[in-house]
Every structure is written in C-alpha cells, then in structure tokens.
Amino acid sequence: MEKKNEILPVSLVTAEEMRAYDTYTIQNIGIHTEVLMERAALALADECMLLLKDAHKKPREAKVLCVCGTGNNGGDGLACARLLADRGVETEVLLVGKKEKLSEAAAYEYRILQAYGITVVSFGEDGFPAKEYSVIVDALFGTGLSREITGDYKQVIETINDLPGKVVAADIPSGIDSDTGKIRGTAIMADRTVTFGFAKRGLYRYPGASYAGKVRTADIGITEKSFSVGEPGMYTLTGDGLSLFQNRRPDGNKGTFGKILIAAGSQDMA
C-alpha cells in the first residue's frame, strides 16, 4: 500500500534484460515457460473482460479475436483465447505465419486450442476475417522484434488499426521497439497494454508511449530475485508524491524549472 506523498521507483527494462530475468526464473527458480505463459494469458484475459465490462457487454454478447504470431508472444495470445472461451466469450484466433514455425511453447498452446475446438484461421490461407470484434488481442510480436515490419504482418497491423474494436496488446504493441519506443515500419495502436514482469522502456518513450494506451504491468512470477543477474539500467517514478512537483510552464527554461539536490554515490562505496 502506497503511503501519502510517497514516490516509488519502477523498473524499466530492455529486451536483453527481460530475457535474462526470464531465463533466470526458468532455470534457477524452476518456473516453466508454460507456467509463465499461462499467467501472462490470464492477465490478458482479465484485461479483455474489463474492457467488455466497460462497454457494458456480457461475455456471451461479445466477440474477441486473438491475433497471434508464431513466437512466445503468439503463445500468450493462443492461451488467452482458450481462457476467454472458458469464460463464455466467443473467441477466434488469427494465426499470422506458418504453424510449422510455432515456438515449442506456442505449439503446445495451439494443440490445446485444437482440442477445445476453437476456430483458428490462417492469414496466409484465408486472409483477415471479415467480421466485427468487440476486442482484438495483439499477440504478434513481443520484445524480440528487431526488424522492420513488412508483408503480411504490416497488412494485418494496418487492418487492425482500421477496425472499431478495442485493442489489447500483449507485452508491447507490435511494431514498437521495446528499448527505444521507435516504430518499426508500422505499429499497433493499442487501447490497453498488459506488459509482463517488468515495464519495457519503449512503453514510456515516444512515439511508443502514444501507441501503448493505458499500461498495466502484470506479475507473472518473474520477481526482483532475477536482478541477481544484473540490475535494470533505468527506472521511472510513480506514486502520489509526484503531485508535489509543479507543472512546468510551456515557455519555461532551466532558470524557472527549479533546483534539485542529488545525493549520490557508488554501490558499496558510499
């Protein structure tokens, strides 16, 4: 519970840092990839249900499309589709990419979807579904994106951005560089982003911040114990204590912004 006028540090991690924390959790703590994926999917499903509630839609009156890539981010979306179906929501999946290229964890979730009988449409074979959806889950790319988006992926992203349904992004909106916030050719314009474990830098750097919508950091089992492999290199601040800072004048400068005292030292030396 936050105390009055408290200012709290929040970790902002790079893709490389997040991979290290994820690996530590799997190898040293013993939490399997599928468990982390299930918890990420639960957080996504919860966010979808909140959006449906805000729109005054009952689960059986809603229709959700989970747009999934072939990596673990896509696996989060596949698992989310199953969890939404369990809650009575009509849910479909659009797979972008060949199912033969699914990661091991995503392929595991895909097999479960088949057993559930949930509709999975291949964009390469069938194109984008000509339907309206209450909510669209963006699970195309996660923090591992390192190239410009072209081809089918670009077409899918631009189609989603033109649709009226609300968009929930898994971890980070597809097309946003998770370190810099830059757009990799095109990007999902999300209404909500559920980021997993720790917040990503690109969600708070522009233009990425303007694409993320409302950001929520979900606890999926990756804790600060993983910082034993290396502390995050960047933090931001949160808490109601931030209200103590005055708004800057539009025509302000360093002479009018005020003064600050920094007490600093090196670790183990001060």
Residue ranges: model-predicted function:
Residues G117-G124, T150, S174-S178, D240-Q246:
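Short gly/ser/thr-rich secondary-structure transition/capping motifs
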Residues G124, T180, A264-S266:
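Short, well-ordered turn and helix-capping elements at secondary-structure junctions
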Residues K131-V135, L140-E231:
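Internal gly/pro-rich beta-alpha loop/helix module
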Residues E2-V96, S103, L203-A270:
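Small-residue (G/A/S/T)-rich helix-start motifs and N-terminal tracts that mark the onset
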Residues T14-E16, K99, I172-G175, T193-F198, ...:
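A short linear-motif detector with a strong N-terminal bias
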Residues A45-L140, E148-A170:
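Nucleotide and nucleotide-moiety/phosphate-recognizing core
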